[in-house]
């Protein structure tokens, strides 16, 4: 299955807010769907920078950079967005978008080791040039820690039973082996959902530090935004969406300050204004079933504190 960009038009339109020029960042280039559309709507003076650490995504991005001088790809995690932009002399931008989902090519290529539907080496690394593979990580992790990770990151109620079965199995080399162990250990299957879905998600999140990276990325993104600059982020599961929701809520809410012996006063430290929350349409889900859980949250940088 080729990669289909989710919430494509909604994301780019929310990011631009009727502008046709400026400096923008695609924090998760993937296969470039959002970036291509963004570039098509910008004038010749605009600049678009993109981040990715997936080798195949970087190949696609390098080809685009050859075609379009307005575009630059940066081989790095979006968790390093502020440092990397400052290294190239960019202190502020007009908009930042991020699509937090795993791309279809990553899921569909068995050799990447993300999918329980196809047999392949048990890898799951976004950047397969460094770090532990899922197979190596599963050998090292303690059973209790694994159970907690499957419960927390996979929201899997049967995490302890599954973790015990995985650790008892010893060395695992393929996704099919792991999927079979989870399937056997799982006492009850959800309708239309493979029993290994939540466990694979949890392991992928853990070895790629996905939620940690999101927590680091969000405040840096706001630091980089110019006044009225937009932040548009697509999430695909409740853990991601909750982080984004809580961050935007915190950055758009007055805080209480109670000085010693003094009545509480509201202090305006707001940096963001909520713009919208958009759910993927039924039509898009029919065309691309993998988009079914997608949400887009959009916020705008305030001009100044209390603006």
Curated annotation (Swiss-Prot):
Catalytic activity, EC: 2.1.1.199
Predominant location category: cytoplasm
Domain of life assignment: Bacteria
Keywords linked to the UniProt accession: Cytoplasm, Methyltransferase, rRNA processing, S-adenosyl-L-methionine, Transferase
Pfam families the UniProt entry points to: Methyltransf_5
Binding site for S-adenosyl-L-methionine: 32-34, 52, 78, 99, 106
GO BP annotations, alphabetical order: rRNA base methylation
Molecular function as annotated in GO: rRNA (cytosine-N4-)-methyltransferase activity
InterPro entries xrefs: RsmH, SAM-dep_MeTrfase_MraW_recog, SAM-dependent_MTases_sf
Enzyme type, top EC level: transferase
One GO cellular component term: cytoplasm
CDD domains: AdoMet_MTases
Cellular localization per UniProt: Cytoplasm
Catalytic function, reaction form: cytidine(1402) in 16S rRNA + S-adenosyl-L-methionine = N(4)-methylcytidine(1402) in 16S rRNA + S-adenosyl-L-homocysteine + H(+)
Similarity-based family: Belongs to the methyltransferase superfamily. RsmH family.
Record's function text: Specifically methylates the N4 position of cytidine in position 1402 (C1402) of 16S rRNA.
NCBIfam families named among the record's database cross-references: 16S rRNA (cytosine(1402)-N(4))-methyltransferase RsmH
Name under which the protein is recorded: Ribosomal RNA small subunit methyltransferase H
Gene behind this protein: rsmH
């Amino acid at each position: 299955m080729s990669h289909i960009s989710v919430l494509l038009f909604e994301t780019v339109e929310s990011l631009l807010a009727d502008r046709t020029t400026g400096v923008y960042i695609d924090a998760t280039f993937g296969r470039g769907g959002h970036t291509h559309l963004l570039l098509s709507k910008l004038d010749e003076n605009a600049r678009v920078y993109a981040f990715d650490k997936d080798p195949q995504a970087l190949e696609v991005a390098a080809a685009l950079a050859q075609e379009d001088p307005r575009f630059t790809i940066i081989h790095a995690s979006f968790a390093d967005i502020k440092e990397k932009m400052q290294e190239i002399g960019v202190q502020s931008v007009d908009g930042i978008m991020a699509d937090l989902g795993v791309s279809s090519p990553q899921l569909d290529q068995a050799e990447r080791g993300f999918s329980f539907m196809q047999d392949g080496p048990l890898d799951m690394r976004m950047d397969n040039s460094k770090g532990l593979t899922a197979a190596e990580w599963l050998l090292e992790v303690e059973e209790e820690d694994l159970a907690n990770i499957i419960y927390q990151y996979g929201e899997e109620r049967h995490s302890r039973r599954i973790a015990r079965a995985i650790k008892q199995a010893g060395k695992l080399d393929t996704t099919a082996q792991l999927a079979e162990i989870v399937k056997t250990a799982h006492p009850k299957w959800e309708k239309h959902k493979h029993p290994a879905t939540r466990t694979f998600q949890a392991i992928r999140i853990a070895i790629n530090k996905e939620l940690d990276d999101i927590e680091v990325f969000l405040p840096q993104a706001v630091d980089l935004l110019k006044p009225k600059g937009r932040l548009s982020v697509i999430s695909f599961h409740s853990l991601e969406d909750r982080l984004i929701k809580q961050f935007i809520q915190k950055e758009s809410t007055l805080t209480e300050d109670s000085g010693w012996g003094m009545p509480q006063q509201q202090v305006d430290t707001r940096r963001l204004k909520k713009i919208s929350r958009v759910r993927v349409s039924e039509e898009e889900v029919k065309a691309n079933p993998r988009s079914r859980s997608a949400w887009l949250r959009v916020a705008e940088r305030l001009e100044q504190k209390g603006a």
